Amino acid sequence: MAETSSLISGVAQRYAGSLFELALDANSVASVEKDLGRFEALLSGSEDLRRLISSPVFSSEDQLHAIGAIADKAGIKGLVGNFLRVVAQNRRLFALPGIIAAFRQIAAEHRGEISADVVSAHELTSAQQNELKATLKGVAGKDVTINVTVDPSILGGLIVKMGSRQIDTSLRTKLSSLKLALKEVG
């Protein structure tokens, strides 16, 4: 399993690096990041799209046509639209979530920022996001860009991943720890 994960990570890093270089040459890093975010939102909102990118059952041609149609309908054109088509043609759609995360990380490093992935049980308000950014800036010593995802299964609290560090204050983890402690006592 770890071998597969590192393979996907390697593929994602190479594709993200190539896309970043192209975006930098075209002076369009911000717009590429925005388009990737729009595609990521489509991906998180559609089980069928997630199945399309992860299933080997679909042919390269089917994936290429579907991704092209989805990108066109979503208004994702230019560099990102072409990039998605190349990824589909090369049968690397399974790596798209990793590619998007790697691109964000590379872009943040280029801006002198650090990127943090935040999982919350509920949608964070802009005031909460700003407070979290300020707190993380104090910890990291750099400006922090946060990518927030909502996962109700954590019940409450936050899970923050910043570089190689993870801070898990989720209620689910606290309940699991309490359950283990009670098993040891009883």
Curated annotation (Swiss-Prot):
Residue ranges of the TM segments: none
Cellular-component GO terms for this entry: plasma membrane; proton-transporting ATP synthase complex
Single GO molecular function: proton-transporting ATP synthase activity, rotational mechanism
Cellular localization per UniProt: Cell inner membrane
Coarse class of the protein's main subcellular location: membrane
Membrane topology: Peripheral membrane protein
InterPro entries: ATP_synth_OSCP/delta_N_sf, ATPase_OSCP/d_CS, ATPase_OSCP/dsu
Keywords, sorted A to Z: ATP synthesis, Cell inner membrane, Cell membrane, CF(1), Hydrogen ion transport, Ion transport, Membrane, Transport
Database matches in Gene3D superfamilies: N-terminal domain of the delta subunit of the F1F0-ATP synthase
Domain of life: Bacteria
Pfam annotation, one family: OSCP
Subunit structure as annotated in this protein's UniProt entry: F-type ATPases have 2 components, F(1) - the catalytic core - and F(0) - the membrane proton channel. F(1) has five subunits: alpha(3), beta(3), gamma(1), delta(1), epsilon(1). F(0) has three main subunits: a(1), b(2) and c(10-14). The alpha and beta chains form an alternating ring which encloses part of the gamma chain. F(1) is attached to F(0) by a central stalk formed by the gamma and epsilon chains, while a peripheral stalk is formed by the delta and b chains.
Role: F(1)F(0) ATP synthase produces ATP from ADP in the presence of a proton or sodium gradient. F-type ATPases consist of two structural domains, F(1) containing the extramembraneous catalytic core and F(0) containing the membrane proton channel, linked together by a central stalk and a peripheral stalk. During catalysis, ATP synthesis in the catalytic domain of F(1) is coupled via a rotary mechanism of the central stalk subunits to proton translocation.
Protein family: Belongs to the ATPase delta chain family.
Protein name according to UniProt: ATP synthase subunit delta
